[in-house]
From Swiss-Prot:
Highest taxon of source: Eukaryota
Subcellular location per the Swiss-Prot or TrEMBL entry: Cytoplasm, Cytoskeleton
Miscellaneous remark of the record: There are at least 13 actin genes in potato.
GO terms for MF: ATP binding; hydrolase activity
Encoding gene per record: AC58
Functional summary from the UniProt entry: Actins are highly conserved proteins that are involved in various types of cell motility and are ubiquitously expressed in all eukaryotic cells. Essential component of cell cytoskeleton; plays an important role in cytoplasmic streaming, cell shape determination, cell division, organelle movement and extension growth.
CC per GO annotation: actin cytoskeleton; cytoplasm
PROSITE patterns: ACTINS_1, ACTINS_2, ACTINS_ACT_LIKE
Keyword vocabulary terms for this entry: ATP-binding, Cytoplasm, Cytoskeleton, Hydrolase, Nucleotide-binding
Organism: Solanum tuberosum (Potato)
Protein name, UniProt field: Actin-58
Entry-linked InterPro entries: Actin, Actin/actin-like_CS, Actin_CS, ATPase_NBD
Name of the top EC class for this enzyme: hydrolase
Amino acid sequence: MAEGEDIQPLVCDNGTGMVKAGFAGDDAPRAVFPRIVGRPRHTGVMVGMGQKDAYVGDEAQSKRGILTLKYPIEHGIVSNWDDMEKIWHHTFYNELRVAPEEHPVLLTEAPLNPKANREKMTQIMFETFNTPAMYVAIQAVLSLYASGRTTGIVLDSGDGVSHTVPIYEGYALPHAILRLDLAGRDLTDHLMKILTERGYSFTTTAEREIVRDVKEKLSYIALDFEQELETSKTSSSVEKSYELPDGQVITIGAERFRCPEVLFQPSLIGMEAAGIHETTYNSIMKCDVDIRKDLYGNIVLSGGTTMFPGIADRMSKELTALAPSSMKIKVVAPPERKYSVWIGGSILASLSTFQQMWIAKAEYDESGPSIVHRKCF
């Protein structure tokens, strides 16, 4: 199957914020672009501008001043299929420059993805893009594979949603998966809000992208939040400056760690949810008592929102406080965790043992979209 580049499987990880796509067997995705579809705010006035009705990804990002930006995925689940189709089309034809009818495609999905959504993905792949074969894998399971494990609990936190997914011998345990509708986008929103308190105003969809960049470059997680706050009041050691696209320089201090603190204290943004540490603990407690030790010893972080410096130490500290005192706790934060879902997909799709797992076009034609529930679990 993996004979040369011509029929190399494609791996497409559809996050809420970024699309990661490339070829199975590669060690990193070739295309990473924002999952945005932008539509012009005003009708074109210049003749010959050749204005498109929609822009995707980086092009939408660069023209963001004149567009209204929309993300077709909300909280990890696809909410707008037309836009989703545009994004896949852009992925295959413009980014990877391949003909999807010549390659098997491995797609990823959020844990607890509604059944109808898996069927719709399957249908679009076979009917719109005519792929010869496809497969849908759960994001967290792929992250675990990428870390070289088959048992562990994955905390996957991206732009739209966070999940804790316990996995035993390669199978996700659905009864113990917990979902937290708190992720990168909420942190960006919170940072927009607390920067306003400093007198900086960020309001439009385009300005939100600037704040997201501030968050990614300067935020970190405090080991002891209260103590860090006290320090920041008396010393300027946490202050950093950031240059805006127009050349203006802003200073950001305690906001640096106040922003991601929301992951551990959702109440800071008025959410009545457990933080990521408590959600991880609750997820482990829903599992059989015999496998908990294996889970505590293999807590794997995955996704862009786990990229904050200090997250593994803080996670370790919080879980040690919750778990039985004799329990050995190990939090693993692989350096490539921003892309570990994609990397896991690349590994899986290139295994010789996986080749009989694909859903072939013939099987789809015979059984219809529901085949996805029988073949992908």
